[in-house]
Amino acid sequence: MRTSSESHSRSDAFNGKNDASQVTVDSDSASKDHHDHDHHHKDTSINERQSQHVHQQAGVSKVEAFNKALYQSGPSGRLLLYVLVASLALTMFAYALDQGITYQFNAIASSDFSQHASLGAVNTASSIIRAISKPFLGKLSDITSRPTTYVVVLVVYAVGFAVAASSQGLAAYIVGASFTAFGKSGLDLLSDIIVGDLTPLEWRAFWSGMLATPFLITTFINGFISDAFVPNNWRWGLGMFAIMMPVLLTPAIWTLYGMQLKAAKMGMVSMGDSGLARKDGVKVQGMQQYLPMARSIAVEMDLIGLLLLGLAFSLILLALNLAPASNGGWSNPSMIAMLVIGFVILGLFIAYEALLAPVPITPKRILTNKAFLCALTVDVFNQMASATRNNYWSSYIYIIKPWSNYVWTIFIGTTTLTLCTMSPIGGLIHRATHRYKTLMVIGAIIKLIGYGVGLDGNSRSTLSTARLAVSQVMLGMGAWTVIGARVGSQASVPHQDLSVVISVMSLWSTMASSIGSTIAATIWQDRMLNYMREECPPSTPEATLKKIYGSIKTLKTKYDWEDPVRMGAIRAYTRTNGIILAVSLVLAAVPVVFSCLMPNYYLGKQQNAVTNTDVLGERTEVPRRVEEPTNGKPSLWQRVKRGYYKET
C-alpha cells in the first residue's frame, strides 16, 4: 500500500495544494492516536449516512468473491479475464465502426429521400430510443443474464440495419435507425457495467477510456467505407453492418456464458449472470419462474414511467422537427395536437413519478446525491451542446470543402480521434494524481473555447480549415470532462447502485442529445432556405433552391465548386451553422460551472468512495486531505479553495 505522503506527492502538484495541508490515513487495521480516531469516526459516519438506505446484497458479495477467485485461481482465471478483455475489444470495435460512419449515412440517406432538412428527426428518434432502452435492458438482464441480453441486442441490431438498408422512405429508415439505436444502447450499458465491476476508482477512467480506443483504427477504416459507399451505395454499407455485427459480437457472448459456467461450478456468481443472481443471489430457472417475475420486473424498471417519458419526448421533439416542413407549418392541427398532448403526458409523467411510481426511474437516494446531480448536469449539457453542433456538422463540412469522401470522413472523425486519445491519457492522470476534478474542469474550459474557435467574428461559422481543425481537436479534449463526470458519479454510490447510476446518467444525457438534435433541426429548418434565397443569385429558381435545400448530394455533385449557386449555398450554410454553434457555446458554459461543484474524491484502490471497499469487497486504506485551522476568519480565497477541494 502506498503511504499517504507518496499518494499525495503527485496529486498535490496537479491540484495545486499548498504546504499548509497535511494528510492522514484511515485504516481499520492500523493503530491510531486519539486525533486520528476522531477523524476516522467522522468519515465512517459520513459513509453510513450516504448509504443508510442501501445494504450489501447477497449477490454483490458473491460477485466480489468470484472476482477474487478469478484473480487468484491461477492461469485459468487469468486466461478467462484476458479472453473477456479481448472479446470486449471486438465488441467495441463493432460499436466504433457503427458510430464512425452512420452519421454520414444518415445525412446521405435523408438526402436520397430529398428530406435532408428532416435529418434531425432521424437523430431525435434514435436518441429517444437509446435513452429509454437503457433501463429496460438493465432489467432484462435481471431476469435473463448479460450474455442473453447481448443476444437480444445483437438480433435487434442486425434487423435494424437490414430495415434501414432496404427502406424506401424516410419513415422506414427512421424505424431501422431506431432498432440500431437499441443495439448501441445495449453495448454502452453492458460494457460500462463490466468495467465498473472489475476496476478500482484509480483505474476506472483509464479502462473506460480504453473502450473507445478502437475508434483510433476504425476512423481510418470508415474513410475507406465512406469512399466506397457514399453517396450512391449507402444501402450496401448498412447491409454490410448487418453481417459484420454478429461476427464481432459473438465472442463476447460466448465468453460471458463461459464465465457463468465457471461460476456455477465454483458455486459463485459471475458478472455475466443475471442481475437477480448478482444482486440477491437468486438463480432463475424455468418458465414457471420467469413469468411470475415479469410483473415485478416491470414495476422495478418503472415501465409505465419509461413509456410516459418516451411518448412525451417523442411527441414534443418530433413535432418541433416536423412542423416546419409540414403543410401549413405550425398552423397544421396535427403538429399542435402532438405538442399539446406531449406536454400533457410529460406532466402526467412528473406526477406519476412523484406520487404513484412504486420504483421511480431515479430513486430518491440518487436524487439527493450532490455528486450525481452535478455530474448529471455536466453530462446533460455536454451532450446537448454536442448534439446541437453535430446534427448538421458532417453536412456542413461536406458542402463547404471540395474534399473527397475519404478526407471528409477522416476530418469528421478528428474529434473522435482526439477523444479516444485523451480518454486513456486522462485515465492515467487520474491514476497518477488520484484526483479527477481539476482535469474535469480543464476539459470543460477547453471544450468551451473549442466551440468559440469555430465561430467567425461576424457570427458565421468559419471556413478556415486550420480553425475548423483546432476546434475539432479542442472539442475532443472535452473527453476529460466526460470521464470525470463518469468516475465522480460512480464513486458517489455503493457497488449495488452502480448499474442504477449508469442507467440513469445514460437515460437523461441521451434525452439531452435528442433535445440538442431538435434545437439544431429547428434552427436549420427556420433559417437555411431563407438564407439560400438571400445568398444565391437572384435569378435562381425557387424549385432549384428547394432541391439543394433538401439534398446535400445534389448540391455537392450537380454544382461545381465555382458555381454561383454553390457559393451562395455555402454562405447560407455558414450563417445557419453560426447560429447553431453559438447555441452550443452557451450550452457548453454550464458544465464549466458544475464541474467546479463536484466533490474532489480520492481515487484509490476502492471500488467506490462510499463504502471504501475494493473490487473484492475488502476494506481499503483511503488517504484524505485535512486542512489546518486558520487563525481568525478565513479569507474569501481560502473559503473558495476549501470548497473546491472538499472531498464530500
Curated annotation (Swiss-Prot):
Q: Which PANTHER family match?
A: LOW AFFINITY HEME TRANSPORTER STR3, MAJOR FACILITATOR SUPERFAMILY
Give TM regions. Answer: 79-99, 151-171, 205-225, 236-256, 303-323, 336-356, 409-429, 438-458, 468-488, 500-520, 578-598
Taxonomic path: Eukaryota, Fungi, Dikarya, Ascomycota, Pezizomycotina
Single Gene Ontology MF annotation: transmembrane transporter activity
Spell out the GO cellular component terms annotated for this protein, sorted alphabetically and separated by semicolons. plasma membrane
What superkingdom heads the lineage?
Eukaryota
* Entry keyword set: Cell membrane, Membrane, Transmembrane, Transmembrane helix
In terms of SUPFAM superfamilies, this protein maps to: MFS general substrate transporter (SSF103473)
Species: Zymoseptoria tritici (strain CBS 115943 / IPO323)
**What kind of membrane protein is this, topologically?**
Multi-pass membrane protein
Polar residues bias: start-end ranges: 47-58
**What is the protein named?**
Siderophore transporter MYCGRDRAFT_70577
Question: Could you tell me where the Basic and acidic residues compositional bias lies?
Answer: 1-11, 29-46
Q: Which family does it belong to?
A: Belongs to the major facilitator superfamily.
Signal sequence range: none
As for what it does, the entry says: Siderophore transporter; part of the gene cluster 14 that mediates the biosynthesis of a ferrichrome A-like siderophors which may contribute to organismal virulence.
Give the start-end ranges of region Disordered: 1-58
Compartments, as annotated in UniProt: Cell membrane
